[in-house]
Amino acid sequence: MLDQSQVQKIAHLARLEITPEEESQFASQLSSILDYFDQLNELPTEGVEPTTRAIELSNIVRGDRQISWDGDNAATTRQALLDNAPEPEGDFFRVPRIMGGDEA
């Protein structure tokens, strides 16, 4: 079981102000946690590789695919994109001016 000086040191390191009643409560709780870690230390871990995760993580992303602007569907695709633009201007997207100059 942790004594009060150890609990006070832990509280100081954690920048906590605790009352004497809390000291005895935390001493009991922290001792239980440390006892649990002692139990974990008894597990047979020989041959177990150290790891940071239980399973491997990897990014799952869709594969890139090239869209051809040439060919039969080029005009249809281009027009569909322009039809969804807020302010199309001919075959271009009209966007707000971000640099200085006269307003168009």
From Swiss-Prot:
Reaction(s) the record says it catalyses: L-glutamyl-tRNA(Gln) + L-glutamine + ATP + H2O = L-glutaminyl-tRNA(Gln) + L-glutamate + ADP + phosphate + H(+); L-aspartyl-tRNA(Asn) + L-glutamine + ATP + H2O = L-asparaginyl-tRNA(Asn) + L-glutamate + ADP + phosphate + 2 H(+)
Signal peptide: none
Alphabetic keyword roster: ATP-binding, Ligase, Nucleotide-binding, Protein biosynthesis
Pfam families: GatC
GO process terms (BP): glutaminyl-tRNAGln biosynthesis via transamidation; regulation of translational fidelity; translation
Top-level taxonomic group: Bacteria
InterPro entries: Asp/Glu-ADT_sf_sub_c (IPR036113), GatC (IPR003837)
EC number: 6.3.5.-
Stretches the record annotates as Disordered: 85-104
Record GO terms (molecular function): asparaginyl-tRNA synthase (glutamine-hydrolyzing) activity; ATP binding; glutaminyl-tRNA synthase (glutamine-hydrolyzing) activity
Family, as annotated: Belongs to the GatC family.
Its biological purpose: Allows the formation of correctly charged Asn-tRNA(Asn) or Gln-tRNA(Gln) through the transamidation of misacylated Asp-tRNA(Asn) or Glu-tRNA(Gln) in organisms which lack either or both of asparaginyl-tRNA or glutaminyl-tRNA synthetases. The reaction takes place in the presence of glutamine and ATP through an activated phospho-Asp-tRNA(Asn) or phospho-Glu-tRNA(Gln).
Subunit composition and interactions: Heterotrimer of A, B and C subunits.
Record protein name field: Glutamyl-tRNA(Gln) amidotransferase subunit C
